[in-house]
C-alpha cells in the first residue's frame, strides 16, 4: 500500500514512516521542514542518529514532498497515487498564552481541513490521524460518597498550600483516580486541546460525507529518541532530559505525584500501523470515526519518571519544587482496552528499559522559534 505520512520528518512521524516501510508499505512523506522544528542550514539536527545539515531527514525509501499541509498545491502533489493517509503534521504542546490560539487553529485545524478536502477529491478513503489525551481535560475521578464526578477546578489557595488533589464538587473531599476510556466526555482546556477536538470533528464529518474509514489515535505522554529538546512546547520528558544533559536536576512541579501514562514512540508507531490495517480491512470502515487511547496501560507519577531518567542518565537527583501552574491537569490515566480489542494493540516497551534508552538517545537540536 502507498501511504502518505504528514509530518514525516518529525519526532513521531519519522518513527511511523520507518515502521510503515519495515512492514512493506511504500511511504511518501509531506513535511514543511520548518526551521523552527528542524533547524537551519549550518545547524546539525539529530535525526535517526545522524547529524543532518539544516535538519533535512534522510529517509531511505521515503519520497519526501517538502510542503505545508495548509498549502492545497503541496497536498495535491503529496496525495497523487496514495492509498491511505497517516496525518501527524501539527503544532504541538499545550501553548503558552492566548497569542498561540491563531497558530494552533491555523496549523492544526485549517491544515486538517485542507487535507481532508483534498482526500475527498482524490478518492482516498482511509485515514489514521494523531489526536491526544488532552481532549479529555482532567482524568477520571471517583468520590467515596458520590461515585464518578467531574472535579472542581483546583483552588489557587489549595495549590499554594501544597494541597494538589482535586476535590469533589458535591462534598469537597479529595478524589480517587480511575482510568479514562474513549467514551469519556471531551473537555479541552487549552488551545492545543481545542484544536485536537476540532480535528476529530472534521475527521468524523469527512467519514460521514465520504463513507471513508477514519481512526483517531489519542496519544498519551509519548517519549523516545528524536524528541525535541527543551522548549516551552516540549513534553515534560524532554524538558527533564534536557536539564540532565545540561548538568541540572529535573525540576518537578507540585509534589511529583501527578499520574501519567508514558508510552514509547516505537509503540505509538506500531499503533499507527495496526490502525492502518483496521481502516484497510474494513474494521473501521462504516463511515464514522473511531478513536482509541494509545497508552502503555502502566501509569507512573511524574516524580517516578524524573527519577528513572536521572538514575539512567547518571545525573543529579530531581528536585521537587512545589511550584504549580494554574490549569495543569493533576492526573490522567488511560484505559488501553479499546485499542487492544479493536486494533490488537498493546504497548511492548517496559517503562524502565524505555526510560533507560531515552536517557541516552539523541534529541533534536533546539529550535530557533516555536514548534
Please identify what each model-predicted range represents.
Residues 21, 79, 116-120, 204, ...:
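A structural alpha-helix within SAM-dependent methyltransferase catalytic domains
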Residues 1-219:
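N-terminal Rossmann-like NAD(P)+-binding domain of SDR-like oxidoreductases, especially those catalyzing
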Residues 41, 142, 229-238:
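A glycine/serine/threonine-rich, flexible loop-to-helix segment
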Residues 74, 78, 195, 236, ...:
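Hydrophobic alpha-helical packing elements
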Residues 198, 202, 206, 236, ...:
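Hydrophobic alpha-helix immediately C-terminal to the catalytic Tyr-X-X-X-Lys motif of short-chain
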Residues 97, 168-190, 214, 218-229, ...:
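A conserved pocket-lining segment of Rossmann-fold NAD(P)-dependent short-chain dehydrogenase/reductase
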Residues 245-371:
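C-terminal substrate-binding subdomain of Rossmann-fold SDR/epimerase-dehydratase oxidoreductases
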Amino acid at each position: 500500500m502507498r501511504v502518505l505520512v504528514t509530518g514525516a520528518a518529525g519526532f513521531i512521524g519519522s518513527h511511523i514512516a520507518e515502521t510503515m516501510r519495515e512492514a512493506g508499505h511504500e511511504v511518501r512523506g509531506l513535511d514543511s521542514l520548518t526551521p523552527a522544528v528542524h533547524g537551519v542550514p549550518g545547524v546539525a539536527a539529530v535525526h535517526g542518529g545522524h547529524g543532518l545539515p539544516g535538519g533535512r531527514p534522510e529517509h531511505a525509501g521515503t519520497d519526501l514532498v517538502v510542503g505545508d499541509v495548509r498549502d492545497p498545491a503541496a497536498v495535491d502533489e503529496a496525495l497523487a497515487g496514495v492509498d491511505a493517509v497517516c496525518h501527524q503534521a501539527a503544532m504541538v504542546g499545550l501553548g503558552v498564552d492566548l497569542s498561540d490560539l491563531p497558530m494552533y487553529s491555523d496549523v492544526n485545524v485549517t491544515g486538517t481541513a485542507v487535507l481532508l478536502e483534498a482526500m475527498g477529491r482524490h478518492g482516498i478513503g482511509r485515514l489514521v490521524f494523531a489526536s491526544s489525551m488532552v481532549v479529555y481535560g482532567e482524568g477520571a475521578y471517583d468520590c467515596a460518597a458520590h461515585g464518578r464526578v467531574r472535579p472542581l477546578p483546583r483552588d489557587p489557595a489549595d495549590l499554594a498550600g501544597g494541597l494538589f488533589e482535586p476535590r469533589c464538587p458535591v462534598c469537597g473531599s479529595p478524589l480517587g483516580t480511575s482510568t479514562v476510556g474513549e467514551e469519556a466526555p471531551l473537555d479541552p482546556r487549552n488551545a492545543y486541546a481545542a484544536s485536537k477536538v476540532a480535528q476529530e470533528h472534521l475527521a468524523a464529518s469527512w467519514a460521514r460525507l465520504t463513507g471513508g474509514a477514519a481512526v483517531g489515535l489519542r496519544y498519551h505522554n509519548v517519549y523516545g529518541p528524536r524528541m525535541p529538546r527543551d522548549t516551552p512546547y516540549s513534553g515534560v520528558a524532554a524538558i527533564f532530559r534536557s536539564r540532565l544533559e545540561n548538568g541540572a536536576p529535573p525540576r518537578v512541579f507540585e509534589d511529583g505525584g501527578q499520574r501519567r501514562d508514558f508510552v514509547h514512540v516505537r509503540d505509538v508507531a506500531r499503533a499507527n500501523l495496526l490502525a492502518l490495517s483496521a481502516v484497510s480491512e474494513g474494521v473501521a470502515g462504516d463511515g464514522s470515526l473511531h478513536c482509541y487511547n494509545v497508552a502503555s496501560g502502566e501509569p507512573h507519577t511524574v516524580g517516578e519518571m524524573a527519577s528513572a531518567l536521572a538514575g539512567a542518565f547518571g545525573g543529579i537527583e530531581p528536585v521537587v519544587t512545589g511550584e504549580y501552574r494554574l490549569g495543569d491537569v493533576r492526573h490522567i490515566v488511560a484505559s488501553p482496552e479499546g485499542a487492544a480489542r479493536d486494533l490488537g494493540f498493546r504497548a511492548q516497551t517496559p517503562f524502565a528499559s524505555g526510560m533507560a534508552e531515552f536517557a541516552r538517545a539523541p534529541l533534536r537540536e533546539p529550535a530557533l522559534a516555536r514548534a
